Amino acid sequence: MVRTAIQLYSLRSIDEPLPAVLDLIGETSLDGVEFAHRVRNADTDAVLDALDRNDLAPAAAHVGLDALEDDYEGATALYDRLGCDTLVVPWLDPEHFESAETVADAASRLGAVANDLADDGFDLQYHNHDQEFVPLGDGTAMDELLASVDDLGFEIDLGWARAAGADPTALVERYADRVSHAHFADADAETMTCVDLGEGDLDLDACLDAVRAADVEWYVYEHDDPDDPRASLRHGAETLDSFR
């Protein structure tokens, strides 16, 4: 059964401790959360208590590649304690996608971490923005990256893929066996800015058909820069709930 979550980066401007933010999420219909950087500085016991009292599951965690390389043991210990077995590299700078050589270097780094994580019971995924969809070879840099790392999952950000000029539904169909989490975000492709879900250029109906056909497990709401994060939380939860 499909489950819904929010990427906590969307709520980073709420000036409350993370457990209090989780309590706000618990007031919605969302089933879980996708952690961002704040969890690394929070009281883990308090976070676990908040997850439990709000019946929220850890959908995944965004963790930088440098953080995984520099403190692998610390990162895996934290997320293991949180019961989070899916780690997602949320961003690599555009220079990583400029050429076949730079993509190969990024793939080598991601592949090494993915192998270590698999041995320790974790899955590694990569979350796109727009820079990954530059032309490369017979496809895009994103295609080349995924072709180079067999154990790398693809957390597709539907809105950023569309803003980059890619076809998010075709991507979901092509990589269905690697997409367990999909980011439902929206953007204005002309200005390359995030907007409320349903107000940008994303064809929500087509994307919903694609993720359903691919049996995507988690629908994750994200808005990079909402004017009102609490209202955005409610809007995201209600919209994803309507997709069940």
Regions found by a protein language model. Give the residues of each.
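Histidine-acidic metal/acid-base catalytic patches
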Residues: M1-A5, S10-G26, L78-C84, D119-D123, ...
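Catalytic-core regions built around general acid/base machinery
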Residues: A46-R53, D105-D116, A206-A210
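Short amphipathic alpha-helical segments at helix-loop
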Residues: G32, P94-E98, M192, Y221
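Active-site acidic/histidine proton-transfer and metal-coordination neighborhood
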Residues: L65-F154, R230
